[in-house]
């Protein structure tokens, strides 16, 4: 007996940050046929890349069953990690970059891999701020979330004399 085919879902994601680091927000819009669900959140002190990853993670985690997911993002960082082999290379090198430095946002990359595991995900790049309706919608929501976090400024970064540990 053949298993039933997976449902095909569109996931539109965006992250925003007021300063980098600074207050940030993320948004994810899920669409299945005529049904939509908008998810969003924010953090007081984060980066734009962390918010891009968080949007994808939370969108995928909201799915109740394994799906075929078309993930639309305006983040080269997110898309190229999968489509250009960055993530595969980082993992082979023990979460190190080609230069031997620890991969930034490893915690979120690992969370994203877990969130993706039950699904078949295809990444699509959408150029930001070009009038793409869903991208504009998640961009507005991510910025709204970032602004709602702006009450708490990031603590100043203290200079350090030591190398980062893995």
Curated annotation (Swiss-Prot):
Cofactor: Mg(2+)
Alphabetized InterPro entries for the sequence: RNase_H, RNaseH-like_sf, RNaseH_domain, RNaseH_sf, RNaseHI
GO biological process terms on file: DNA replication, removal of RNA primer
Cell compartments where the protein resides: Cytoplasm
Manner of cofactor binding, per the entry note: Binds 1 Mg(2+) ion per subunit. May bind a second metal ion at a regulatory site, or after substrate binding.
Main location: cytoplasm
UniProt feature, compositional bias: Basic and acidic residues: 131-144
Keyword Cytoplasm: yes
Pfam family, one: RNase_H
Reactions catalysed: Endonucleolytic cleavage to 5'-phosphomonoester
Stretch list, region Disordered: 128-166
Keyword terms, alphabetized: Cytoplasm, Endonuclease, Hydrolase, Magnesium, Metal-binding, Nuclease
Organism superkingdom: Bacteria
RNase H type-1 domain residues: 5-147
Binding site for Mg(2+) 2: 14, 139
Residues annotated for Mg(2+) 1 binding in this entry: 14, 52, 74
Class of this enzyme: hydrolase
GO MF, any single term: RNA-DNA hybrid ribonuclease activity
GO cellular component: cytoplasm
EC number annotated for this UniProt entry: 3.1.26.4
Family: Belongs to the RNase H family.
Function: Endonuclease that specifically degrades the RNA of RNA-DNA hybrids.
Annotated PANTHER family: RIBONUCLEASE H1
Record's subunit section: Monomer.
Protein name: Ribonuclease H
Species of the source: Thermus thermophilus (strain ATCC BAA-163 / DSM 7039 / HB27)
Gene: rnhA
